[in-house]
Amino acid sequence: PSYVLFVGDVAQIPSFSGNTGSHVSDLYYCTYDGASDIYPDIYYGRFSANNTAQLIPQIEKTLMFEEYTFPDPSYLDEVVLVAGVDASMAPTYGNGQINYGTDNYFNNAHGFASPHVYLYGSGSPITSDQSIASSSILNDVSEGVGFANYTAHCFEQGWADPAFENSDISGLSNTDKYCVIVSNCCLPNAFDNQACFGEAVVRANGKGAVGHIGASNNTYWNEDYWWAVGSGSISANPTYSQTGLGIFDCLFHDNGEPVSDWFTTLSQIVHSGNLAVTAAGGDEEYYWEIYHVMGDPS
């Protein structure tokens, strides 16, 4: 098999305790080359649910994507990209990640006519440090986006600043316009928590996300930047030629990358990001342990 989907929360399918910190990790269900192996042989994800009411929305959203039964699929060309608030790190790390995405991929040449971009400090119509940023992002998601990426600070219940938290999910109105969310930040997929952000946003019935990618423990600015952009020097304006392959490159793979570097499913996105951390000499074992897919890995 190429994929495994765990169905249930930790009470139904226990997770492993990480070797590199106090976090849960499903990694070791999928490594088969001895105790020191940290590279999964099977792509994996989790439908975290304690009951059928939490499970059924995840199945229904996934089937809509699998069968392509969207009433209006045009929303898939909408994206939200957020460099969250951190006065010290966001101008280079956060803005660099988002700038790399828009310069190379999330642009008109790739069918994204008007990406909803929130840079820190300056450079976008609404910056992430403005008071209206949170409500604007929630409105974007409610109107329908296919993909959302946030990089900055989080906690177990969601994005910190601009805020997008568990308590905001009930107010969303994106029925039949579900998104994939990638949260490069601390703890949004801490699925041993009562209900982390990643669990809540995919469990939501008739709204929220079809899948959420995030970490079950704290993340780090260097590694999260490399995870998205690729190995190389940290810059506010990185270029393809100056970096290795990160998740954006492997997802779009339109620069002549070999087929072996095409990573397009949710669990493959995680895999490509972790490979970038490995290539950069970052804290690889920790990252292979903490990044998870809440949703269908395939």
Feature locations, PLM:
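Cysteine-dependent hydrolase recognition
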Residues: 1-298
